[in-house]
Amino acid sequence: MYKGILKYTTIMMALASASVFSAQPPSSPMSLNSGQTLQNMPQVTMQAMDNAALRERDARRLASASEPVLQFAEPIAVSITPEADWTSLPTIQGERSYSVWRTKISSPGALSLNLGFEEFYMPEGGALFVYSASGEQMIRPFTAKDNEDHGQLWTPMITGDAVIIEVNIPSDKVEFLRLKLTSVNHGYVGSDLQDVFLESRIMSGSCNVDVVCPAGDDWRQQIRSVAAYSTGGSLFCTGSVLNNTANDGKGYFLTADHCGITASNAASLVTYWNFENSYCREPGSGDSGGNGDGQLNQFNTGAIFRAGNSSSDFTLVELDDPFDPAHNVYLSGWNANATLNTSAVGIHHPNVDEKRISFENDNVVRTNYSSSTPNNNGTHVQVIDWDLGTTEPGSSGSPLFDQNKRVIGQLHGGSAACGND
């Protein structure tokens, strides 16, 4: 058997709020709760794209890439602001007037959409909502708590080819709102949300092992530290949260340099937590190589670039916001010792798929990238072959753990796949 080598290293209407003068923002879109319908809602439609052609383009690129990064969406540059289309509707009971603006964004044929706002500042008491045209999918409200020094906001994906952007804001605060949509990202690979078109999915190999399987029982804490993430609304990789010597709970997130995070685009990072199948699919089965049932509804958005190095292929960012306790994120330990005498475990998201786990029972080797010669001063750790599971495009940046459950590197590249461990 050939042994694959792996190297780690958003019309305006005036409404009233029953919570008069409260600074609390609305928890759901007022346009949906008011019983009022908005006629002639502004719509912006993107030019149609050929999803199959985009996937074929990427397949050619990935076939020759030694450092594969999975692209799942095509960015479309736009410039959309809520400076027009402000219309008033009759107010309802209460004393404080709220204003609502919304518009529909469509990209025909998209399997998913996500949005990038290069200008975002939400005054206290206001909220931005992004939801599907049917109203069935809705991202949590973005409020003043999401204001950051870099002034940007990037959203997680929503399934389908149309979304509605809605702003609810106290009318006396409208002049302070800053909002500019600059990127509509047309998903052509898909996601594992339930109503994605199954025939368009690029699925991970059947030999992969779901983290919910018994094989992952000894790694439950470490599994909670690993996330799939997107940058620029178009590229997917994997990364992990690390503890630090101050034990202060900061969100230091480790991934691969070749995944392309820089100081200029770190604000666009969106991490997805607990994106996992709900049951163990038997490794090697058609079920394991098929569509999963994981959800992409637990996320952090935005980060600050802290460090990176191309030779060892690492990037470290600090996530903008604290972790939501409901997401149960774990901060993994790490081991920077030069001497390695350990088996290894990889936890990762292959091909934008639910989280998987892989095992190497033999000792890993310290070496350099593109070399198989042992080198105690090398920049990389080599996994000669996986004994259970594998890694694939999308796994890049995922952590490699030693036998003591400490991170010793992140996935750089290699030729592993089902049948080529």
Predicted segments with their positions:
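Gram-negative bacterial Sec-dependent N-terminal signal peptides
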Residues: 1-21
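Protease-domain processing segments flanking chymotrypsin-fold serine proteases, especially trypsin-like
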Residues: 22-101, 145-243
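Extended extracellular/luminal ectodomain segments enriched in beta-structured repeat modules
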Residues: 107-114
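Serine endopeptidase catalytic core focused on the charge-relay Asp
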Residues: 158-384
